[in-house]
Amino acid sequence: QVVGTLDCPVHAMNLEQAIFMVRRCYPDHVIVAVDASVGRSEHVGCVTLGKGALRPGLGVCKELQAVGDIFITGIVGGCGSCDPLMLQSVRLSVVMRMADYICDSVRQALVPEPHNFCRRVL
């Protein structure tokens, strides 16, 4: 189940309600939280995966409830002065390409195709 889309996003104003709904409807499920993030300039375009909760809003100095058991982030901008307008300048095409990559990667991990054990990268 996907919660949060372009048409119906999860954001600071509805985050707590979304977390409550997910925990109530899927109490024994692992929650994978996915978000765009800021990081070191040389890491822009990288995807991170880790164990533990995602802390949304940290890049813009917001204190929001942590979410998830596993997190995936796409680094879309360099960290700086906690300026919320900085993320407004990120090209949507960058975010969409990273979202497509993350989606394809999760799908391949959960529903592997037969004989899809390796992929040529060079």
Protein language model features and the residues they cover:
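N-terminal catalytic or cofactor-binding beta/alpha core of small enzyme domains
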Residues: Q1-I31, A36-L122
